[in-house]
Amino acid sequence: MGKNYAESAKLIDKSTLYSSEEAMNLVVKTSKANFDETIDLAVRLGVDPRHADQQVRGAIILPHGTGKKVKVLVFAKGEKAKEAEAAGADFVGAEELVEKIQKENWFDYDVVVATPDMMGVVGRLGRVLGPKGLMPNPKSGTVTFDVAKALNDIKAGKVEYRVDKTAIIHVVIGKKSFGPEKLKDNFRVLMDAIIKAKPSAAKGQYLKSVSVSSTMGPGVKINPSKVLD
């Protein structure tokens, strides 16, 4: 690891579970790269994601957004395609875009939205979009006829969270330049949503561990029992 990482790591006590306020101060202080580092949240949950009734997923609009310009692909036709273009979609199309993705392995976008009538066509992409977390889904509001609202929400800083195979949720909560206060606001809104999404089938401790880190910096552990303090 580089000199910056080593210096940053000295500021963090690995055995300490910090409050969210302390953690946001530390993650900003230990972000020393010469670019605006992204701040990531990792939450390990007490669920078994192999069971359908222990899935945790959803979407929430972060009060301060993510600081990232999000490219959106919309599968729609006719009036809905025009609506998507007017609302600022980066790419709009139908079968021709499905072919482009299949033939060219084209993934130059961050979010995919589809109108329900297009899902028969988009379904053919399940194998390629699914593993990348790009498959449109009604639960996260990305399968909808209200494409303008979906686009506005995404551009306003809507993030999707989803537990992975190892029972961890990884989400971006902002940039170093946001400063501790805005990062804390985003963190709390997201943690509140994750707590409310607890499956009834999940037994025992739900929040196993919570940590934040910058792109090039060390992780900072947060006390799971005080995430909303």
Curated annotation (Swiss-Prot):
Keyword Cell cycle: no
One GO CC term, this protein: large ribosomal subunit
InterPro entries named in the record: Ribosom_uL1_bac-type, Ribosomal_uL1, Ribosomal_uL1-like, Ribosomal_uL1/biogenesis, Ribosomal_uL1_3-a/b-sand, Ribosomal_uL1_CS
Keywords: Repressor, Ribonucleoprotein, Ribosomal protein, RNA-binding, rRNA-binding, Translation regulation, tRNA-binding
Record bears the keyword tRNA-binding: yes
Pfam families hit by this protein: Ribosomal_L1
Any one biological process term the GO annotation gives: translation
GO molecular function terms noted in the UniProt entry: rRNA binding; structural constituent of ribosome; tRNA binding
NCBIfam families per UniProt: rplA_bact
Subunit text: Part of the 50S ribosomal subunit.
HAMAP family associated with the record: Ribosomal_uL1_B
Function summary: Binds directly to 23S rRNA. The L1 stalk is quite mobile in the ribosome, and is involved in E site tRNA release.
Family stated for the protein in its record: Belongs to the universal ribosomal protein uL1 family.
Entry protein name: Large ribosomal subunit protein uL1
Gene source species: Clostridium tetani (strain Massachusetts / E88)
Gene from which the chain derives: rplA
